[in-house]
């Protein structure tokens, strides 16, 4: 069985919600990261066997494919998206490793993309089969309403951010402890390179 290694990484700037990146399409941000990760790994985009990206809200159909094409990945190289909520980009990396270890691929670009400021609003599903006649109909915010639709009926309305806050409160985890854990994680990543 082949061994899977991460040869390089890149990320784009992180902006505030509805901030300076609000007009940038997800595929354009992702394409920039693909190009830079390939450069840091000293690989040509044509060497890729697959591109896999995690994307939770997915307003661009197969944003992985769109980003790959924008980045200059040859069109014969396939790409797909995984959605595992907050672990989507991690699942993309796991899926890439699985392909390499099973000898389905040699070189895979994997990561994630999300542009929260570009999330669409949507209509109540009944609008599809009961067209509007008279009266107002609500719009739903994808982030506020859509994310809670995947939650269990037992815990309605809890997205990952609220869940993290509840867990921190329940177990007495301080912000300083979280920051120290994050710093240690970054240190380990730097040492591993």
Predicted segments, located by residue:
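Acyl-thioester C-C bond-transforming condensing/cleaving domain
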Residues: 1-2, 17-46, 61-62, 68-69, ...
């Amino acid at each position: 069985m082949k061994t899977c290694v991460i040869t390089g990484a890149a990320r784009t700037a992180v902006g505030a919600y509805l901030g300076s990146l609000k007009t940038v399409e997800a595929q354009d941000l992702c394409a920039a990261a693909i190009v830079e990760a390939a450069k840091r790994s000293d690989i040509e985009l044509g060497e890729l066997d697959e591109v896999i990206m995690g994307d939770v809200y997915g307003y661009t159909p197969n944003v992985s494919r769109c980003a790959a094409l924008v980045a200059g990945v040859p069109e014969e190289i396939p790409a797909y998206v995984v959605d595992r909520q907050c672990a989507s980009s991690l699942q993309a990396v796991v899926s890439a490793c699985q392909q390499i270890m099973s000898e389905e691929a040699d070189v895979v670009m994997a990561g994630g993309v999300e542009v929260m400021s570009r999330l669409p609003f949507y209509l109540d599903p009944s609008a599809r089969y009961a067209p509007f006649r008279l009266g107002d109909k609500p719009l739903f915010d994808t982030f506020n309403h859509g994310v809670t639709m995947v939650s269990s009926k037992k815990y309605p309305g809890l997205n990952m951010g609220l869940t993290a806050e509840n867990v921190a409160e329940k177990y007495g985890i301080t912000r300083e402890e979280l920051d120290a854990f994050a710093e240690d994680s970054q240190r380990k990543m730097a040492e591993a390179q």
